[in-house]
Amino acid sequence: MLPFWIALQFLSSLPIRLPGMPQPQELGRSLLFYPVVGVLFGVLLWALSTALMGAPLLLHAALLLTAWVLLSGGLHLDGLADSADAWLGGFGDRERTLAIMKDPRSGPIAVVTLGLVLLLKFTALVALIEQQNGAALILAPLIGRASMLALFLTTRYVRAGGLGQALSDHLPRIVGQQVLILSGLACILIGGFSGGVAVLLAAICFIGLRQLMVNRLGGTTGDTAGALLELLEVAVLVGLAL
């Protein structure tokens, strides 16, 4: 179960203590549990939404979004901000884009991007609460985290060394493909027709965003993986809310 706890520690702000430094093989296997962490997040968000039924609609959505951000510790939003700055400021140049991603400062485009993504999530949550579509609260985090597994399965990691390289090098690929298939089936089981629509929408967005990464960088980084997760989450929420 250590790979699960590694995944939960990395993807969440929950106080998880690991018994020492994980081995590279354990880091690679932790990717297999990313969709499981997504389901856990979704169940927690669904439970909170259920508890908030009867609260004013806008407050309900705001509290739900706040919990969503706090659960992940803002980790993937940080990746989205860095990627947005780098994509605009990199002017199509690979090395300049990678260098900007490592800069801890956030420029105006990062702030605007974060604002737009959070606004879209908030308004989609308002619509989904009105529709009483609780399944979307499980589907979005599940698909978002499964997309990171899919990205590492299909895309070269371009920064040598570090956590991302260990994840990429030691990911059990055949089992990873099986986990992705099971994740898709879980989405259909959870959401029915809506679950299938969410998977199709996410797949289309994934293909487009991955191609952008490959064209610019020749692969992915931790920041672009986080950006992918955030953008697929918002795509699923907005798609199901429409």
From Swiss-Prot:
It is an enzyme of class 2 (transferase). Its EC number is 2.7.8.26. The chain crosses the membrane at residues 31-51, 52-72, 109-129, 134-154, 188-208. GO terms for biological process: cobalamin biosynthetic process. It is found in: Cell inner membrane. It comes from the Bacteria. Pfam families: CobS. It catalyses: alpha-ribazole + adenosylcob(III)inamide-GDP = adenosylcob(III)alamin + GMP + H(+); alpha-ribazole 5'-phosphate + adenosylcob(III)inamide-GDP = adenosylcob(III)alamin 5'-phosphate + GMP + H(+). Its cofactor is Mg(2+). One of its GO terms (cellular component) is plasma membrane. It is a multi-pass membrane protein. GO terms for molecular function: adenosylcobinamide-GDP ribazoletransferase activity; cobalamin 5'-phosphate synthase activity. Belongs to the CobS family. HAMAP family: CobS. NCBIfam families: cobS, PRK00235.1-5. Joins adenosylcobinamide-GDP and alpha-ribazole to generate adenosylcobalamin (Ado-cobalamin). Also synthesizes adenosylcobalamin 5'-phosphate from adenosylcobinamide-GDP and alpha-ribazole 5'-phosphate. PANTHER family: ADENOSYLCOBINAMIDE-GDP RIBAZOLETRANSFERASE. This is Adenosylcobinamide-GDP ribazoletransferase. The gene is cobS.
